[in-house]
Every structure is written in structure tokens, then in C-alpha cells.
Amino acid sequence: MILVKDAIINGKKQNMLVEGNIIKKIGNISNSEVSKDETEIIDGKNCVLIPGLINTHTHVPMSLFRGVADDIPLMDWLSGHIWPMESKLNEKIVYAGTLLGTIEMIKSGTTAFNDMYFFLDSIIKAVDETGIRSTIAYGMIDLFDEEKREKELKTARESLEMIKNLNNSRITGALGPHAPYTCSKEILESTNALAREFNVPIHIHMNETLDEINQVVERTGMRPFEYLNSFGFFEDVTTICAHCVHLSDSEIQIMKEKNMFAAHNPVSNLKLASGVSPVLKLLENNIPVTLGTDGCGSNNNMNLFEEIKAVALIHKGVNLNPVAVTAKEAFEFGTKNGAKALNINSGEIKEGKLADFVLINMKKPYLTPKENIESHLVYSFNGVVDTVVIDGKIVLNAGKMVNIDEEKVYELAEEAYFELAK
């Protein structure tokens, strides 16, 4: 059991009892409800307790790519810098990068993430050790080559079977075809079939740049969402579409009809000058918006509080509308909506929800006066949290990682980067 005492929970000072990995009770808790010998006490005095943040689009091992290629367009960034470095990846490098990235996420209040990358054994090992929650997909790219396609699909299937056999509720699988401009029709059709077979979501990059959209139009005569919809890619599956920057009205209608989730990455899209997603149109069509950081190579951090602030500000400015995205909506993009997208019973602090939560010390200049804490968490907070509980276990205590030696991880990360950069 965990007993949180005297924290600000849902707007008022109260206690919260966790039993196993579930929030059992919020409010007044009697001594008879608590097993003294088996209960960890968290002093919530001067703290606000919030649901853990959920990052719905990232490439966690790319924490090692931080700062390697700034201030260039996406295609130059990929072909000139990222893909050449990724050709040097190995299990050791991905493990170090994942450890580094998960520590960064936990220490900034993220309790779950949706990832697409390579060397999944190494990602899973790091996720298991740090205690974070994750949905993981092998990133498939066949570049329209049949031999490559068969290898990618084989690896994807093996990855899903491996994750299923873990029988770990914190680690779930997904399918991750990279994008319509890097994947053949055949691999995309097979992706849908695999997703239905394993009952997992599809995680895919969609309409990030004008250039990639033009590539798909030139090859198929249709825009990306129209093209994928023409052969049933979105049928009977949950699809999490990363970016969604340049969308036609017909594509928005397809997203609405097929109940898709948009994973908005405002900071990455701004840094790569990709554009700004039409979030207001998505909301008008009841398309759920979630938030992602993307990888550190294009952000350059994994602090989801920055995305929450960015989404609240950008759409006000672009639309000349001060209520375009409210603070409440922005916060829910990073919590409640992300939980729905990844089918996690969290994103809110309620009895019966998973015990994935964060405590933040309000005795900070940027969180004062505390009476306006809901505003501060969106507009003035820097993301430095005090305590993180995931799946009913304390993984960050007073700002210190519980399961991992941080100093050793930083050493591993420096060694891994040296190997990547040489």
C-alpha cells in the first residue's frame, strides 16, 4: 500500500490510498483502512498531486541524438544526419539511450510513452528497469523493396510475440510502419492484418511535411490519408497518427470517421519548420488530440510540460483566439486523451484508476501563488517534479530515481554517443 497524506488532489487538500496498482480511495482515510506494516507513506504537504503525463509519440533511444543536427529541414535532417547515425545503432547504444530517455521522462512527470524504434529487446530491458509504462512498436521501413518488406514484417511479428509473452501489464505492443512515403502498400496492408490479429494499435507518422505529402500524391494520385483509406488501412484498428500538420478537409473527415487519434508534436514541428497542426479543426470534428515530444533529435528534450505550454500558446497566436486551446484542454491532451489513445486506465486521479501519478512541490516561485496552481502547471511550470508513482510503485522519490543509478546511466550515455558519432 501507499498512503499519500495532505496533498492537493483535484483542487483540495486530502489523502489518497493506493492498494496494489490501483487508487483505492481519495479523501478521509481511517487507520483501520491502512496496514501499518506494509504501507509506504508519502508526505504530500505543500504538494499538488496530478495524473502522470502520457507521451504519445516519441523515439526514446534518440535521447543520444540531442543537439546533433539543429536548424535544418526534416528531409535534410533525416537523410544527412539521423539515418547515417542510425546505421551505427546496436543493442548497447539503444539500451543506453532508452535509459537516459526514460529517466528524463520520469523526472519531468511522464509515466507512460508510445515509442517507435529498433532493437526492442534493449528498449524493453531499460523500460523494465526504470519502471515506466510503455507501448512499443518496431519501426518498419521497407522503401518499396520486397525482400526488405518480408524482413520488416517478420521482425514486427516476432516483436509483438515477445512483448505478449512478457506478460507485463506495463509493457504493451503496437505496430509501427514509419510513414506512407517510406512504406509500400503491401507492408501497410499487412500492418492492418497484424494489428487485428494481435489486437494492438497502429502508430504511424502522417502528414508531417508538405514534401512527404507531395511524394505520396505524385506516386498514388491521392493525399496520404486518402491513399491509406483506399485499401482499408484504418479499418477495425486504433490508429495513433503522429504530427498531422498539413491536413485537407477530406483527410480530417477520414480521421473522424475512423476514430483516429492525433499525436500533436508542437515543439518538434516548430523546430523543423514543418508547420502547425490545425488543432482547432480537429477539435471541431471531435478528433482526440494527444501530445508527443518526438525524439530528442528534433525537440531537443522529452519534457511534456513544454508541449502542454506550447499547444496552449501556439494555437492562440495562429488563430488570433485567446481561447483556442485552453489550459484545461492542453493539460488533458497530455493526460486524459493520451490514456484513451493507449488504452490505459489512467490520465485522471479517480478511485479505480491505475496508480500512475506525480507529486510536485508548490513551494517554488513559478508555482506561487498556489491558489492558481492549475494555470501554473500549464503556463509557468518547468517540469521538475518531486515524486513519481507508476503502477503503484514509487520510481522517483524526492527527485531521485529509485531503481536506477543515474550516474552510471550518464556514463553509459556518453560512451554510447562517442560510438555513434565516431
Curated annotation (Swiss-Prot):
Manner of cofactor binding, per the entry note: Binds 1 zinc ion per subunit.
Q: Which Gene3D superfamilies match?
A: Metal-dependent hydrolases, Urease, subunit C, domain 1
**Assigned keywords, A-Z:** Hydrolase, Metal-binding, Zinc
Q: Kindly give the InterPro entries that the UniProt entry links to this protein.
A: Amidohydro-rel, Deaminase_MtaD/DadD, Metal-dep_hydrolase_composite, Metal_Hydrolase, MTA/SAH_deaminase
Instruction: Look up the record and name the cofactor or cofactors this protein needs.
Output: Zn(2+)
Superkingdom, natural source:
Archaea
The entry's substrate-binding residues are E86, H178, E208, D294
Q: What class of enzyme is it?
A: hydrolase
According to its UniProt entry, the protein's GO biological process terms are: S-adenosylmethionine biosynthetic process
User: What residues bind Zn(2+), as annotated?
Assistant: H57, H59, H205, D294
Reproduce the miscellaneous comment text.
SAH is a product of SAM methyltransferases and is known to be a feedback inhibitor of these enzymes. As a result of this inhibition, organisms have evolved efficient enzymes to metabolize SAH via different pathways. The pathway found in methanogens differs from the canonical pathway, it uses the deamination of S-adenosyl-L-homocysteine to form S-inosyl-L-homocysteine for the regeneration of SAM from S-adenosyl-L-homocysteine. 5'-deoxyadenosine is a radical SAM enzyme reaction product which strongly inhibits radical SAM enzymes.
Q: What does this protein do?
A: Catalyzes the deamination of three SAM-derived enzymatic products, namely 5'-deoxyadenosine, S-adenosyl-L-homocysteine, and 5'-methylthioadenosine, to produce the inosine analogs. Can also deaminate adenosine. The preferred substrate for this enzyme is 5'-deoxyadenosine, but all these substrates are efficiently deaminated. Likely functions in a S-adenosyl-L-methionine (SAM) recycling pathway from S-adenosyl-L-homocysteine (SAH) produced from SAM-dependent methylation reactions.
Return the similarity comment. Answer: Belongs to the metallo-dependent hydrolases superfamily. MTA/SAH deaminase family.
What is the name listed in the Swiss-Prot or TrEMBL entry for this protein?
5'-deoxyadenosine deaminase
What is this organism's lineage?
Archaea, Methanobacteriati, Methanobacteriota, Methanomada group, Methanococci
